[in-house]
């Protein structure tokens, strides 16, 4: 198995566990150039809030969308948008990525700004 297939297998297992909990989930996707975060309803059919380094407000203030500082800004924005949508508690779905670097920075920034998981 290659790295990509292994990551997808881990993500599938995690999402199955979160689906059993019937909780709203904070889903993170990391590409080489950007980072994306979505708050998805417990049923999995609606996106309640989203933030990424592609947003105009975020993009203008960053030199690069693929570093820890950019991830922290996205974490702060997703927490603010989730709270505005009435979401306080989420399950963290790291999409099979290691809890390290950009993924960790996004999660910690979201926690500091009011999301609990």
UniProtKB/Swiss-Prot annotation:
Signal peptide: none
Keyword Ribosomal protein: yes
GO molecular function ontology, one term from the record: 5S rRNA binding
Acyltransferase found in the keyword field: no
Keywords recorded for this protein, A-Z: Ribonucleoprotein, Ribosomal protein, RNA-binding, rRNA-binding
SUPFAM superfamilies in alphabetical order: Translational machinery components (SSF53137)
PANTHER family: 39S RIBOSOMAL PROTEIN L18, MITOCHONDRIAL (PTHR12899), LARGE RIBOSOMAL SUBUNIT PROTEIN UL18M (PTHR12899:SF3)
Subunit and interaction comment: Part of the 50S ribosomal subunit; part of the 5S rRNA/L5/L18/L25 subcomplex. Contacts the 5S and 23S rRNAs.
Family per similarity comment: Belongs to the universal ribosomal protein uL18 family.
Summary of the function given for this chain in its UniProt record: This is one of the proteins that bind and probably mediate the attachment of the 5S RNA into the large ribosomal subunit, where it forms part of the central protuberance.
NCBIfam families: L18_bact
Protein name in UniProt: Large ribosomal subunit protein uL18
Biological source species: Neisseria gonorrhoeae (strain ATCC 700825 / FA 1090)
Source taxonomy: Bacteria, Pseudomonadati, Pseudomonadota, Betaproteobacteria, Neisseriales
């Amino acid at each position: 198995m290659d790295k990509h297939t292994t990551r997808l297998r881990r993500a599938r297992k995690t999402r199955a566990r979160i689906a059993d909990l019937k909780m709203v989930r904070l889903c993170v996707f990391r590409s080489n150039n950007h980072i994306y975060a979505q708050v998805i309803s417990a049923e999995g059919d609606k996106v309640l809030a989203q933030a990424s380094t592609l947003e105009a407000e975020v993009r203008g203030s960053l030199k690069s969308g693929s570093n820890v500082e950019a991830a922290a800004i996205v974490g702060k924005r997703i927490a603010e948008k989730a709270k505005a949508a009435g979401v306080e508690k989420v399950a963290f779905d790291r999409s099979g990525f290691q809890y390290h670097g950009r993924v960790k920075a996004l999660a910690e920034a979201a926690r500091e700004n009011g999301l609990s998981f």
